[in-house]
């Protein structure tokens, strides 16, 4: 299969020749996706502060410590904060990290496999996505209300991704965490979020998505009847994207961009 548009060709027609020009092409790809699909995220805050609200040192049958942490940081409209859970396995050395964007608060299931992750020697940070901003059309809720919205402003995928990066900001200050080995994870629209987060934030070595579909890992040019199309994603979740994205409804096979560009942007530099 020939993927369109060409991954290693700039918008002006020039070809990527080496690692240095790939860096330039990668930034061009991110700007295309910001402009056409996910919107532009604000710059990261200068600092992120964290407060441990509670701590259970005998979680997961005594194999881990569970901490409830609240982080806070400055935004365009003042201070914003949200909580997350941190599971730390018993270890004398720094451990790799999973940051999970989760639909269900504090419900351990196949989407929130805390004990399996701990038993394999990883730390797990769990963000309930509604604590960042609600999964609704309300653009004044939570983080979405802390920035003015314009044509190319972020949708909620960008906001949830921003929240995951701020959690990583804080966790990189913790000596228990191996900051060289961090992954961001999500399912469905949070799978889209995990991919967009990993593409923008090079500190995440891995981006792991499950069933991310249209607007995630699905290649639009190859879709057939019965696949999730842009129109389906916009019908159910218009607030997840920038205001430009709906203009591509019905044009999945004609996109001047596609999701292989997103996946390539996650590749190590």
Q: What role is predicted for each listed range?
A:
Residues 199-205:
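Conserved hydrolase catalytic core segment
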